[in-house]
Amino acid sequence: MQASIESTGNLERRLTFTLPQERLETHVGGRLRELARTTRIKGFRPGKVPTKVIEQRFGQQVRAEAMEGLLRETFDSAVREHSLRLAGNPRIDQGETDFDFVATFEVVPDFGDIDVTKLSVVRATAEVTDADIDQMIENLRLQRRTWNPVERGAQVGDLVALETWSQAGDERLPAEGVETGSSVLGSGVMFDQIEKGLEGLTKGEEKTLTVDFPAEWRVPQLAGKTVQVHVKAVEVSEPVLPAVDKDFIKSFGVKSGDAEQFRADIRTNLERELKGALMNRLRREVGEQLIAAYAHVEMPPRLVESEARSMLAQQVEQVRRSGRDPGQVPADAHQGFMDAAAKRVLVGLLVGEVARRNELRLESKRVSETLRLIASTYEEPEQVIEMYRNDPQLMNGLQSRVMEEQVIDWIAERAQHTEQSLSFQDAIRV
C-alpha cells in the first residue's frame, strides 16, 4: 500500500494514500457475478442475466459501495501502519487521480505519564432511608392534590389566582388591562418580593408592591428598575392531599394496592436515581481532577470547535423544547462554549488513553445490567431491551457510556480518595 504521512500542525496530520485498483476491480467483478446469479429480471431466466445488463443496472452502485468500503479499509490500515491515534473524524478529499486520496485529521496529544495515583478524589456515598421513601410518598400526594377555595388570607402552600399590572416610571405593563396567572406560594415560581407580598391577601383584596428587579431580569422593561406592581387576589385555595389508600397506590401501577409493595417499588426507583446521581458526582469529581492535572496539554483545535458547536446546538434545542424562540443564532455563538468544550475534550481523550494504556475492556455484564436498569423505567421493559439490541446506534451509545463509567471507577479506586457521606437529598442535588 502506498501511503505517506506529514505533520501540518502540532496535532494535525495529512495522510496521502492510494487505493489498490486491482482489489477494487476484483471486488466489483465478484459482486456483479453474484448479482447475476441471484437477481431476477423480467425477460431473463434466473441466473442467466447477461453481465452487461447487470453492469448497466447495478454497476454504478456496486462500484460506489466497493470504493467506500475499500477507502475505509485502506485508511484504517494506513493509520495502524503509522501507529496513529485519531482525535475525531478525518476529512478525506480526492487526490490527483480517482484512486488517490488525502486525509486530514487530528491526533491524540501526548499526555506523558498518566499517574492517577496522584489524583485526590472525593467519593460521595449515600443510601435510601425510610424517611426518603416517606418524603417521596408525600411528593406523590402533592402531585395529586386538589384545591379548595378559602376565605382566609393566603399562606405558604396555597394557590393564588391573581391579576397584575406594573408601573415602571412612565411605562405601564401591560399598556392596557391586566395580566392573569396563578402561583403556589413558596414554590419559587414568582419573583421572591412579589410572592412574599401575596401572603395574607384574601379573595378580592388588592395591594401595591414596591419591587426591585435585578439587572438581568428576563423582562427588559423591568430589568434593573424599582417598579410598582399592583396585584389582586382573584381566588385563594388551599391544597387537599389524597389519602394513601389502595386506590391511590393502584394509580401508580401497583395492581395489588399493597402499601409494602408500593414502598418497595419506591425504594427501587430511588436507589436507581441515587446510583445515577453518585456516578454523575464521581464523573464530575474525576473530570475536575484530570482537568487540573493536565490543563497544560494542548487539545486538538478542530475537535474542540466541533464539541463547542455541538454544545451550542444542544442549548438551542433545549430552548426550543421549552417553547421559547432562540432567535437568530450568530455564526460565532459557539465561541462562548470553547473553554467548556476544551475541558470536555480533554477529559474524554484522557479517559480513552487510560482505557487503552491499561487494556481496560468493556464488561458485557455491566452493559446488560445498565440496559436492564434503563428498561426498568418503562412500562414494557422487554420491548426497550429489544429496541436497544436491534439499534446499533443506541447500543453503541450505551456501550460508550458504560465504558466511560468503568474507567471513572478504575481511576477513582486508584486515586487518593476520601469518602463523603451524604443524605439522599444532598446526593441527588445537582
UniProtKB/Swiss-Prot annotation:
SUPFAM superfamilies: FKBP-like, Triger factor/SurA peptide-binding domain-like, Trigger factor ribosome-binding domain. InterPro entries: PPIase_dom_sf, Trig_fac, Trigger_fac_C, Trigger_fac_C_sf, Trigger_fac_ribosome-bd_bac, Trigger_fac_ribosome-bd_sf, Trigger_fact/SurA_dom_sf. Coiled coil: none annotated. It catalyses: [protein]-peptidylproline (omega=180) = [protein]-peptidylproline (omega=0). GO terms for cellular component: cytoplasm. GO terms for biological process: 'de novo' cotranslational protein folding; cell division; chaperone-mediated protein folding; protein transport; protein unfolding. Keywords: Cell cycle, Cell division, Chaperone, Cytoplasm, Isomerase, Rotamase. Its main location: cytoplasm. Consists of 3 domains; the N-terminus binds the ribosome, the middle domain has PPIase activity, while the C-terminus has intrinsic chaperone activity on its own. HAMAP family: Trigger_factor_Tig (MF_00303). NCBIfam families: tig. Disulfide bonds: none annotated. This is Trigger factor. The keyword Nucleus does not apply. The gene is tig.
